[in-house]
């Protein structure tokens, strides 16, 4: 029996194994490898000198094989996508046997399906199922969670959020054959009605919120000087994950309202009934942001309705097994600034600025760290997890791991998270600040 089982031998699986093998707490946990290709498994064993690490050969399309293998671990890190095609057998086995699960999916249609299929059963077996534990969507979820804590520490536990906006800068973003296959599978394999049903902002939330802010051609970060502008984000799942976290916290607070022992703790995690969230990709100029928004929308529509466009994309995008080099992975970065404003109709709102800075290529190197630390939250900090996690279910990174994951990410050596109150919300040049976290 191992604590963590890494499923998959592609570029992300390799990076997760590399990270776990050199982890600062390596002596406190055990891990194993699982994959379909014996030669790739042997290659990883040889590359990282993992002679004492258990290895399992498994085909994720074979439910019986998956069922047998997952019983040898406490937490499964699943790096095998597209998850719409290959993920259900793994989650089904985990839920049935009370095992825990994290992955790196960016497929909202699949997340919506697994919530409907597995959430209730997971609460009965105590299985913690947390999809979306990579650069999609941990930074977005973390930023709002931390901003909410900063707000309540400054303005009191009854303070609520009106609007939260994140401005993303992704430097040196890589692309592998597996990610390309997952993207194209969303257009070719998923029924159209599933894609439509998984597009609303609150489609993953157990609670319906107020209407979110309307999409725009060009976005501007509030209280930024000079103005930080950008285009629509292609990572729509980020908003949906943030709203599921909001909904799970709202629902938990409502259920615990009459319990004096848990009511205050639950309320502290809520963002407020009028919470709205949006994000965008930063561009140097208004024109570049506008053109990116137009091209993203044209490209998405073309890929969704034109088979010739998907065939062309398949020829141009990386093939299975292809991916960025180790040298390339070290050159990337993610820099995100979030501005959150409180709901305060009688006076000036409180404004919080929170930043998330990651050193390394975001989609693979940083994602492998995020998903590995998510798994270790369960193994090494299980008693410290939020009450929602202890009940099991299909959760989000912040509803399942909360402060535990925030602190683990800050300790990994590549990620910095800071949050501060802007003292003068009326001035766009917000240099006068007070640090609170």
Task: Identify the role of each PLM range.
Residues 57-73, 79-85:
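Conserved Rossmann-fold cofactor-binding substructure of NAD(P)-dependent oxidoreductases
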């Amino acid at each position: 029996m191992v604590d963590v089982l890494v499923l998959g031998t592609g570029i992300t699986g390799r990076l997760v194994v590399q990270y776990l093998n050199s982890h600062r707490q390596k002596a406190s946990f055990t891990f194993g490898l699982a994959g379909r290709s014996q030669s790739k498994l042997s290659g990883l064993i040889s590359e990282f000198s993992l002679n004492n690490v258990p290895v399992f050969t498994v085909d994720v399309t074979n439910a019986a094989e998956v069922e047998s293998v997952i019983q040898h671990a406490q937490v499964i890190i699943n790096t095998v996508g597209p998850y719409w095609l290959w993920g259900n057998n793994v989650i089904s086995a985990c839920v049935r046997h009370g095992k825990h699960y994290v992955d790196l999916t960016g497929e909202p249609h699949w997340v919506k399906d697994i919530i409907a299929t597995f959430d209730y059963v997971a609460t009965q077996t105590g299985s913690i199922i947390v999809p979306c534990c990579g650069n999609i969507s941990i930074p977005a979820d973390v930023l709002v969670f931390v901003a909410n804590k900063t707000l309540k520490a400054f303005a009191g536990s009854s303070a609520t959020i009106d609007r939260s906006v994140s401005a993303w800068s992704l430097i040196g973003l890589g692309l592998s054959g597996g990610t390309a296959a997952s993207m194209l599978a969303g257009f070719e394999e998923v029924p159209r009605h599933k894609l439509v049903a998984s597009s609303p902002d609150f489609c993953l939330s157990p609670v319906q919120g107020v209407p979110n802010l309307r999409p725009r051609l060009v976005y501007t970060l509030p209280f930024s000087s000079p103005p930080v502008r950008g285009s629509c984000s292609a990572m729509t799942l980020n908003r949906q994950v943030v709203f599921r976290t909001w909904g799970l916290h709202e629902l938990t607070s409502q259920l615990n309202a009459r319990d004096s022992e848990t009511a205050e703790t639950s309320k502290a995690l809520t963002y407020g009934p009028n919470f709205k969230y949006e994000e965008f990709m930063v561009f140097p100029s208004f024109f570049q942001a506008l053109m990116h928004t137009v091209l993203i929308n044209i490209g998405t529509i073309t890929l969704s309705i034109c088979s010739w466009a998907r065939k062309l994309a398949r020829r141009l995008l990386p093939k299975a097994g292809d991916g960025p080099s180790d040298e390339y992975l070290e050159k990337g970065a993610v820099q995100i600034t979030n501005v959150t404003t409180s709901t305060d109709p009688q006076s000036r709102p409180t404004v919080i600025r929170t930043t998330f800075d990651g050193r390394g290529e975001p989609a693979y190197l940083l994602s492998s760290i995020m998903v590995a630390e998510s798994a270790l939250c369960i193994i090494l900090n299980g008693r410290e997890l939020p009450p929602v996690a202890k009940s099991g279910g299909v959760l989000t990174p912040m509803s399942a791991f909360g402060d535990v994951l925030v602190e683990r990410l800050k300790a990994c050596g590549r990620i910095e998270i800071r949050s501060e109150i802007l003292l003068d919300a009326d001035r766009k040049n917000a240099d006068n600040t007070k640090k609170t976290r």
